[in-house]
Structure formats: C-alpha cells, structure tokens
C-alpha cells in the first residue's frame, strides 16, 4: 500500500535539516501527510506526491488536467484514512485514494456547490466528515459514507465564503468567513449561526480554532490585523488585536506551545512570522498591540502561498517529545524545510518532556510516493458491482519527470552548518553531485539513481579496447556510496559489468584506478564522481594536484569528449549562482588568482567532434550604435581609459600543440604583451590585426592559433595608449566571458574560483568592471523633419478641412517651423468653404494653377525633404476635403422625396412655366424613381435656367421644354447614352399625344466644367503611394508611444478604398491589404433583398469567425480561440496592431 525506506521518523535524513526543492508546474496548494513523510502539491495538471525522506526520487504524478486552478488541497489527518486527499476542481471536490493506481485514484466526487469552492477542511475527530465552502455563499458538510449530497448546509446569503474550519474540541461546531465577518455554526442548531463575529474592515482571509480552548478563534484579514475572539465571553469585541503593516493571507495557531504564525499577502519580505501569544494581562478586553515577532523565516524571493508543520514523536510515549519542522511553499516554486531550534521552543513556552494527559496518535510512517504494487482496494469492497469503463487509460501520460532535472532543484544542508543553504553555492550532498554530473555529461546515461540507498548505475563508452585503443566500448558501471561519503576513509565502491569486448585485465585496471582516485579524493573530503567519470571516458586525471593542495578546476573544454550539439547546461538560476561575479568574499577572489587551473592538452590531439578551423563564430562586439524613434543615437564602446600603471604582462591561457604531458591540469601561462620589446616598429594596424577574429581563438582552442604570437605596445606613445587599453579590456572581457558563453557550471565544492589577473595597481578586473563599457547618448532630433510634438497637436479628424489646415498652421508656427506653417496657411485659404456648385468655383478648382497643382507641388517638395509627417498629414486633409465636397451620385445613393423634380402634365391650366423670367422652374414635390445621374442633371439644369442675368449663357439656355403626359402623375426618367461633351434629357411616356422632344446641349463650357470636375485633388495612380506614406507614419506614431493617434490615422487611410470606386476603378477585394490595416466596407444587399450576415474575420489568420472566438472588451478585435492560444504565447499586444493588451482588457 505504501513504501517505507527508513524504519521510522527518527531515521529521516531530512528532518532537522534545511531543504530546498525547486518544483515547477504552477502549483497553487500544498498539504502534508499527518505522519510528516509526504507532501502533496496540487495544480491544474494534477497532484505531485513528494517523499520528504527521499526528495531525490522524482514525485508521483496523479494526472487530472483541468482549466481551473486548485484553490485548496488537504491530506486526511486521521490514522484510519492516511491515504485520502481532497482537492478542489471549480465547484467540485475530489477525494483521491493514494492506495490505488494513479490512473484510478479518484474515490469520490462531491458536487453540491454552484460556484467555485474556496476552502476544504477535514473534521479532526471524524475521518469520514469534511466541510466545504464556496463563492455561492454556502457551507456544506459531507459524510463520505453517503457522498451523494451534503448532510448539512448553511449560508450567510450575502457574501461569498472564503474559509471554513472545524472546532478541534467540539466536532459539531465549525466556523466560516464571509466578507468581513466570521460566522460560527452548530450542526445541531440548523442553519442559524451560533454567533457572528464582526470587527474587521476588510475581507477575512484566514480563520483557525485554538487547539486547546474550544471557544477561542483567530482571524486574519486584508486590513492588516489579527483578531483573537472568545465567543463564549463576547461576540461584539475581540479579545486582542494585533496590527501589521501588510495584509495577512494566512494566520494559524502553533501546534505547540503558546504562539501563532502569520504570513503576508504582499510585502512583509516574503517571510513567515512566528509570534508569542502569551500575555500576562488577559483581563483587558480588545487590547491592541503591534506585531512583535520572535522569529522570521526569510528566504523566499516571492510571495509565500502556504505554510505547514511537520512533526515527529515516539510511539506510545507518556511524555511530550515532539519535534517540529516548518514547511513553506512559495510562488517562486521553492518548497523549503526550516529546522526549529530549541531556543524557539522556549520562546513560545513549549515544554518538551512534559507528561501527556493522553497519548499522541500513532501514524504509519510510510510514503505514497510509489505506485502501489497491487490495485486491490483497501476497503476490500470487491463485491461491488463493476462499473464499465467507457474511457480507456492506455493513453494516459506516464510519469516522465526528468530525474536529472529534478535533482538539480534539490539542495539540502545540515541544521548545524555554518553556511546559509539558500546562499551557499557548494555541493552539499550526493544528489547535487549527481545532478551536476548529469548536466555536464549528457552522453553518460544514468539507468538508476537512488540517492536514498546511495546507489547509482550508469552507462557510457570509453576507449578501453586492447586491440584498437581508438575504439570505444560500452561499459555499465554500478556505484555504491557509503553513508558518510565523502568523508575520509569512505570511498565509493565500483562494479563493472562483464563485457565480451572488455578483457579481464582492462576491467581490473579500470577498477584499480577508480579505487585509487576515489581514495585520494575522499581522503581530502572531496567528491570524486566527476574525476572518476572523466577517467573512464579516457581523460588523464592527475592526483598530484590534490597532494599539493590545488583542487582541479572543472575542465571548460568539455567539448573534448562530447559533440557541440549535445552540450547541455544547467538551469539559468544555477548558472547565475556559479558566475564569478557572484564571489562573496575577497578570499574567493584571491583564490582565483592563486589557483587558476586549465587543462593543458598539449599531449593530446585536439579532437572536438568537428573541425574547429571551420568555426567562424565572431568575437563579441567592442562597439556599436543604434537609432531611436525620437532621433537619439546610442553608442557603446569598450572603455579606452589608460590605467594608472600598466601591468607587466597579461596572461592568457591557451592550449599548446599536440604532445605528451605528464600533468594535464598544470597551468602554462603564455605572455602576449611584453614591454621589453621595442614597439616603435609596431603600428596600430598591426595591433588590430593581431587580435583574435574568431571566438574559438579567444578560448585558446583553435588549431591554427600560434602559441608564440605576440602583440606589443609602447607606454611612451600617446597615440597607442587607446590601443593598449583596448587590448587590456579586450583580453579581460574575453577571459570573463568564457563562463557566460559556454554556460558550463563550476562546482565550487571541489574547485577553487577563477578570477581576473592580478595587476600592479592593486586593482582587479572585478573592481573596475563597472567602467568596462561606455554608453553615449546624443540627441539629433533637430536634424529630423518629423516631430513628435507636432503629432501631439496636429488635427486631421472631427473638423472642416480648412479648420484642419488652419490649426496645423498655428501648431507649426508655435514651434518656429515657418515653411510648414506657410504651406498649411495656403492650403487653408484654398479649402475655404464655398457655395455649392458655383460655376466660378468649379472652373477655378480645375484651373492649372489651382489647388490640385499646389498639392502636387507640395508633395513633390516634401518628398525631396523626406518629411514623412507632412506627406501623411497632407494626404489625410485632402482626403477629408474630398469627402466633404463629393455629391451623392458618387456614392450611388437613391434620392427619395426630392424637391425640384420636373413634373409634366397634359392639363394646360396646370402647365408648369419653364422660362418666363422666373428664377427657377415651378416645381412640385412628388415622389418618383430617379436614377443617380438624374440628380446631377437636375442640379445642372437648375443653374442653366436660372434667372440670373449676369450669368454666362449659351444659345441653348433659352430652349423651352414642353411635354405632356397622358398619365396623371408620375413619370419615370432615364438618362440616355452619354457622349463626351453632350447631354440629353428625354421623356418617354407610355401614351403621349405629343411627339417626343429631345434637347441636346453641345460643347457648353459650364456643363463641361461640372462634368469634368475632379474632386479627388490627387492622381489615382499615386493613391497607393500616399497610402504607404500614411501607413509608415502610423508606424512612426507607434514607436513614439502614440497608439491613439496611430489608430486615428489608420482609420482615415481606409477611406482611400472609396476613392477607387468613385473613379470607376473597382477595388480588388481578393487582394489582402499589405499593411494589415483594418479595412471597412458597406455590406450590400443580396439578390433577395436581405442583408448579408455580418461576419468578422480573425485578426490573426484573416478567416471568417463563425464559432468559438475571443473578442477583446477594449478594442473589439476578434480572434479564433485556437488562434488566440497561438498568438498570446508569442505576443503581448493585439495582432491587429492597435496596441491593446487584450488579455488584461478582456472584460473591460
């Protein structure tokens, strides 16, 4: 049913020690086995069961994939049901049975709430009873012997329930928090509360009953107070109030002594505070005090989600010998165990060794981390009717947690260690050593990792063939580590599996050398697994360095034995902790200088798995620059300041030519810069030419690197000083860049540090590192024609065209831009509102020197000036002027109930006078069907026959039209075929007593002016170019941080589509916009006269959205649900380009 490695809690290797576990996976709730052996973490992916006595074993994963975050999880506290765990899943509660297989571990599903469950609590006295509370304001009590419905329900009716807790002394009493209030309920009194406690001014986040006094309860709230109540004495005032400077997320009584623990929701240094509850003066009611913690558990880098207590004691003892350990789970994904010292016990008045009134409960000290061997139900209910399984479990994922990755997140330290666990970078245990080795040697396969039993089994390939030394053979090695490893006299024991390719003599040779290496390292209290693996891989290991007190540095040339493609690195957090910049003391820095060790492979062939002569990776940039959208230029350089005193020689470590070397770990410094050589013959070009051109050369690994190459400098030549300093900085940068670039970690437990070269001035590279780079910022915005301040005040919407131009002229004048201001002033004069369809205005607009000419010349001029802002604004203003002047006939609108429609009637007494000195035709308002072009003809005719004697008239002006219609009323007019320079008006009655009359006006200047009027002011062929200007300007606005102005100008640019249609050029609807703008168009009626369905396209894939979709509540842009999942993984702004952060504004 459960596994047990250690005999009891007092053999636990982690109790009383500091432990840190890195567990990624978005876990939001945590609980602990009552025996203190296991921890359960709950998330949307299911449950993780972690064995605290064997944290190096990967967790057991119970899959349960849901979209809802787990609000709470709790392990059954009863010895009768130690395998039960309850967790939330939205409005349901799930009972898990760990004694079953992970694929069939769900025992019950409790469904009685209509909203999400917020808290769960087992009854401390009845193992089958638990309580749940929910956002639906209800509190339910459940009996697992009848789990179909709750046996008790109550509600506050006003506020959602956030917490529910049972009384430790009375199994019929429970309390729940609703908003700012706490209600105490008695199951025997129905849904009427026993009492209500009101005193908080903000939401209550946590409540807890006193373990020893049945009527006392504590509450913690967002108002930053902790209140202690005794509802047997008073329900209106709290017994005591403790104020803090942060909102409190959880607060509970200690399971020992007289005290309590609280943890903040935000702030509070992400710590858990322990406070003494003992108060000599308990008579004073509602006593207010400030927070005075006796101890603070600090170490997390993010908010603490919850804290638990782990305990152990002897079985059937008459004395209280309990020991405790604090367990915390934080949002930084760290599970930490904190030992409790005897001094803390004394501060909370916990008397260990006191005689017990009743014996403590006895729990089976076993772990549920492993899958059960058999699937037999613990309750032996084999006689239940078998249920059909409609869903198979064959497709369930297996527990594929990477063991090496899991080990890399575990760090454990002794409680008596002088080092801080959470700041220490040294190897502390076998698990950390195995994790580091697994990351460094990805070709070494660990078949078995059991840190608890201290057994390893690994496989690798080594050059141990007697027939051909260059051939690699397969080896399987088993390693047993003593309990006190790596103390002196406790070397590991190696066993090599027999292999047909491995002779007995070679096998004995390998075992003998491994035993020698292990003995030498453990005699110096050093971990020996890495040098042993290196030896089996074929590398020569020197033991003399250990005798001389020099600890070998981890070989950076890991590529000697594995391919570059398979090179792995530790997690970023681990790599950061190993960075030489993080050296904590001056002694560490000095040790770098004294014991800088690189393997000298001058005796070995440079075999890196590929030809390094083809590696052209460049060295890091020494300088560079970039422009900003506001016209600022940022430049960075290596610091060229000449040091006060040059060092005599700068040492660079490199590998020599192939050869035989006795000690491969010895240092062989090489002088690159020498003062004694005359530098007068060395030029600056030679200086630069001698620098490395490839990154591999900077590491001293290139096969073509000449070990005798030198670069010289002259202190007396001022022109060479900058090159000297650059050379110094360059060498230091490359040397310190080794760790960052290769990301190969350093095991500080075995090896000394690596630092900069000592200088005669007494300064190290680290001491002057802040001056290594120089960043210069220069503002050249005055040289640019585009101005952000103009964009903030320019107008191009919600006004008349002349108003736009006049405002923009004043804005340009405000910033002393006279040329731009004059252009806007001229344009505003040309756009002044004129009487509609005045013949003089029409002719002037088409004049060769009119507005169209001016706009064309202005655009050409500003194109030469490269003034993108002015080009885009001119296009927007001209387009707004066109929209104002364009008549209805260009939009194809029907005109209904038009006044001025010509009416024909055959009644002489009712004849309409057409031209008898009156100013216009006598008209009658009548509804008639008119084609769009007729309206233009009618307006033209109205001007032609006007009585203005001063107007220009042709001979055709005096032609009288008379037509009689036999029908009483209505006539339908159609426009005949048109020819250039002529117009015809005709009437075609069905039964006319008079012959048809047709009047043509030929070569009329005024009519031609109207007919040929160009209302666009722009060349149609140039419209795509102008649209490009607007689009590029919108991108510039976005880079300036003006998303609203960007959206406005993009909206204006979409009106260019109507410009195409008005000129008789149909837009290409099949062509996608190259600018990803939001294009709008009118929905036309279909052949049945019904409007088409208003469908919207996805802003990601541009396909129609018909089913599940994501609609932003702020910008109203639409995405398919599947497209939204893809986009929000790679982007943080709306895919339409509007600049909205849609996930945050979803329900705006």
Curated annotation (Swiss-Prot):
Its main location: membrane. It is found in: Vacuole membrane. Residues 432-543 form the RWD domain. The modification Phosphoserine is found at residue 759. Present with 556 molecules/cell in log phase SD medium. Belongs to the WD repeat WDR59 family. Component of the SEA complex composed of at least IML1/SEA1, RTC1/SEA2, MTC5/SEA3, NPR2, NPR3, SEA4, SEC13 and SEH1. This is Maintenance of telomere capping protein 5. It comes from Saccharomyces cerevisiae (strain ATCC 204508 / S288c) (Baker's yeast). The lineage of its organism: Eukaryota, Fungi, Dikarya, Ascomycota, Saccharomycotina.
């Amino acid at each position: 049913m459960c596994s047990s490695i250690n005999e009891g809690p007092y053999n636990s290797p982690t109790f009383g020690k500091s432990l840190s576990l890195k567990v990624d996976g978005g876990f939001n709730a945590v609980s602990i086995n009552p025996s203190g052996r296991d921890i359960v973490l709950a998330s949307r992916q299911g449950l993780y069961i972690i064995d605290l006595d064997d944290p190096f074993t990967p967790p057991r994963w119970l899959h349960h994939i849901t979209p809802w975050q787990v609000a709470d999880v709790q392990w059954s506290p009863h010895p009768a049901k130690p395998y039960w765990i309850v967790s939330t899943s939205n409005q349901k509660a799930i009972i898990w049975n760990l004694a079953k297989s992970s694929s069939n571990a769900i025992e019950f599903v409790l469904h009685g709430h209509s909203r999400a469950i917020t808290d769960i609590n087992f009854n401390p006295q009845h193992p089958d009873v638990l309580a749940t509370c929910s956002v639906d304001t209800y509190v339910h009590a459940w009996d697992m012997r009848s789990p179909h419905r709750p046996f008790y329900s109550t509600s506050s009716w006003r506020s959602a329930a956030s917490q529910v807790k049972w009384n430790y002394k009375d199994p019929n009493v429970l309390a729940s928090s609703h908003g700012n209030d706490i209600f105490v309920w008695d199951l025997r009194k129905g849904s009427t509360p026993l009492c209500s406690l009101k005193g908080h001014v903000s939401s209550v986040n946590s409540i807890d009953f006193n373990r020893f006094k049945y009527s006392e309860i504590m509450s913690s709230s967002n108002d930053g107070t902790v209140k202690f109540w005794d509802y047997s004495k008073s329900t209106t005032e709290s017994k005591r109030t403790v104020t803090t400077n942060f909102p409190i997320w959880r607060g509970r009584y200690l399971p020992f002594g007289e005290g309590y623990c609280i943890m903040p929701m935000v702030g509070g240094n992400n710590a858990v505070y322990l406070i003494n509850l003992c108060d000599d003066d308990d008579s004073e009611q509602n006593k207010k005090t400030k927070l005075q913690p006796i101890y603070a558990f600090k170490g997390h880098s993010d908010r603490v989600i919850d804290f638990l207590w782990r305990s152990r004691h002897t079985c059937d003892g008459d004395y209280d010998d309990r020991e405790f350990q604090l367990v915390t789970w934080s949002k930084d994904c760290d599970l930490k165990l904190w030992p409790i010292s005897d001094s803390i016990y004394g501060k909370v008045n916990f008397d260990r060794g006191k005689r017990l009134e009743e014996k403590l409960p006895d729990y089976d000290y076993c772990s549920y981390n492993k899958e059960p061997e058999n699937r037999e139900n613990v309750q032996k209910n084999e006689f239940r009717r078998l249920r059909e399984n409609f869903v198979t479990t064959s497709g369930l994922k297996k527990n594929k947690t990477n063991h090496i990755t899991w080990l890399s997140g575990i760090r454990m330290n002794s409680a008596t260690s002088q080092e801080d666990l959470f700041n220490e970078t040294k190897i502390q245990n076998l698990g950390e050593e195995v994790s580091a080795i697994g990351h460094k040697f990805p070709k070494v396969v660990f078949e078995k990792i059991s840190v608890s039993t201290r057994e390893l089994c690994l496989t690798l390939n080594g050059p141990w063939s007697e027939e051909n030394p260059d051939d690699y053979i397969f080896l399987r090695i088993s390693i047993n580590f003593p309990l006190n490893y790596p103390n002196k006299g406790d070397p590991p024991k190696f066993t090599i599996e027999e292999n047909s390719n491995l002779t007995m003599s070679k096998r004995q040779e390998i075992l003998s050398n491994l035993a020698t290496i292990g003995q030498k390292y453990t005699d110096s209290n050093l971990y020996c697994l890495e040098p042993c693996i290196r030896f089996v891989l074929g590398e020569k290991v020197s033991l003399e360095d250990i005798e001389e007190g020099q600890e070998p540095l981890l070989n950076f040339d890991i590529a000697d034995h594995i391919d570059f493609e398979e090179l792995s690195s530790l997690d970023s957090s681990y790599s950061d902790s190993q960075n030489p910049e993080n050296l904590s003391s001056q002694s560490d820095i000095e040790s770098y200088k004294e014991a800088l060790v690189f393997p000298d492979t001058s005796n070995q062939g440079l075999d890196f798995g590929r030809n390094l002569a083809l590696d052209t990776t460049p060295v890091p940039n020494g300088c560079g620059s970039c422009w900003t959208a506001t016209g600022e230029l940022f430049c960075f350089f290596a610091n060229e300041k000449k040091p006060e005193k040059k060092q005599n020689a700068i040492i660079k470590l490199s590998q020599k030519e192939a050869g035989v070397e006795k000690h491969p770990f010895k240092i062989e410094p090489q002088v690159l810069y020498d003062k004694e050589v005359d530098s007068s013959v060395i030029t600056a070009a030679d200086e630069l030419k001698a620098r490395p051109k490839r990154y591999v050369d900077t590491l001293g690994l290139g096969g073509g690197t000449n070990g005798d190459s030198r670069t010289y400098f002259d202190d007396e030549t001022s022109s060479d000083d900058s090159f000297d300093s650059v050379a110094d900085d360059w060498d230091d940068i490359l040397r310190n860049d080794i760790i960052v670039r290769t990301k190969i970690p350093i095991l500080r437990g075995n090896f000394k540090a690596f630092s900069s070269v000592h200088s005669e001035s007494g300064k190290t590279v680290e001491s002057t590192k802040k001056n290594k780079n120089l960043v210069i910022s220069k503002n050249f915005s005055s040289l640019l024609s585009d101005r952000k301040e103009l964009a903030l005040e320019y107008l191009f919407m919600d006004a008349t065209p002349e108003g736009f131009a006049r405002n923009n002229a004043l804005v340009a004048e405000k910033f002393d831009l006279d040329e731009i201001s004059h252009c806007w002033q001229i344009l505003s004069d040309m756009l002044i509102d004129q009487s509609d369809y005045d013949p003089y205005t029409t002719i002037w607009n088409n004049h060769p020197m009119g507005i169209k000419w001016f706009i064309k010349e202005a655009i050409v001029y500003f194109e030469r000036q490269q003034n993108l802002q002015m080009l885009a604004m001119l296009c927007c203003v001209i387009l707004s002027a066109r929209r104002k002047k364009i008549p209805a006939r260009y939009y194809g609108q029907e005109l209904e109930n038009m006044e001025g429609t010509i009416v024909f009637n055959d009644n002489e007494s009712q004849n309409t006078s057409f031209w008898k000195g009156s100013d216009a035709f006598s008209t009658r308002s009548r509804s008639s069907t008119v084609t769009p072009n007729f309206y233009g003809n009618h307006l033209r005719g109205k001007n032609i026959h006007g009585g203005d004697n001063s107007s220009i008239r042709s001979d055709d002006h005096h032609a009288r039209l008379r037509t009689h219609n036999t029908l009483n009323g209505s006539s339908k007019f159609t426009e005949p075929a048109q020819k250039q320079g002529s117009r015809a008006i005709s009437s075609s009655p069905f039964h006319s007593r008079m012959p048809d009359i047709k009047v043509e006006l030929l070569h009329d200047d005024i009519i031609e002016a109207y007919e040929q009027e160009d209302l666009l002011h722009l060349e149609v062929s140039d419209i795509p170019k102008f649209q490009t200007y607007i689009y590029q300007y919108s991108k510039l606005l976005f880079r300036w941080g003006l998303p609203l102005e960007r959206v406005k100008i993009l909206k204006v640019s979409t009106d260019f589509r109507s410009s195409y249609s008005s000129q008789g050029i149909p837009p290409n609807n099949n062509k996608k916009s190259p600018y990803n703008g939001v294009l709008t168009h009118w929905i036309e009626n279909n052949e049945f006269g019904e409007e088409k369905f208003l469908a919207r396209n996805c802003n990601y894939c541009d396909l129609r959205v018909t089913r599940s979709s994501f609609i932003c509540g702020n910008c109203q842009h639409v995405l398919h649900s599947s497209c939204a999942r893809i986009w929000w993984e790679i982007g943080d702004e709306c895919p339409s380009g509007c600049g909205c952060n849609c996930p945050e504004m979803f329900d705006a």
